[in-house]
Amino acid sequence: ERSRGLGDVYKRQLQHMPSIIDIMAAGTAMRFLTAFLAVGEGTHIITGTQRMQQRPISILVNALRALGADVEYAGNEGFPPLRIVGRKLVNSEVTLPGNVSSQYISALLMIGPALTNGLKLTLTGEIVSRPYIDLTLKLMRDFGANVAWISENQLEVKPQPYQAVPYYVESDWSAASYWYETVSYTHLTLPTKLE
């Protein structure tokens, strides 16, 4: 069975993900999956190592809650593990400090196309990770997202599904592993090759 688009791939992933997801010590996975699960289907617990459970995540959780997400702390307030009930998010505006980790910003931007009314993200103060934000925007555009800076400190993402396109990832196993992991979760037959 072939996917009709990247959105279908991710939807399939969610349907086959375990209810408890242990990301071990992967901070990027914790941030990105937290946002991803918030717009998906089903109830999940996302957890990690003891050290991961000491790393704050309240900035992202508060932003997701402002968008209407159902995210609760399953342990200590402000830290993983998290209990996430995926659903459609209808709120579209959220504000973050510009000096937070770009991974919080990227996590929100990447789910923007899945939000019912899109996303308007305002960053306050100095934006310290603009180059990383711009990399996220480029990748999103490569997959058909309509996303742009609409002012010096504001980004807008239009609601629309991502599009499946051939995509070249530098032949570096650590970079390519994410794409192979995505395909492996889907239980679909998708053409994937290294060149």
PLM regions and their residue ranges:
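Short acidic, glycine/serine/threonine-rich loops at helix termini
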Residues: 57-59, 132-136, 160, 181
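Single conserved hydrophobic/aromatic residue that forms the stacking wall/gate
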Residues: 1-10, 187-195
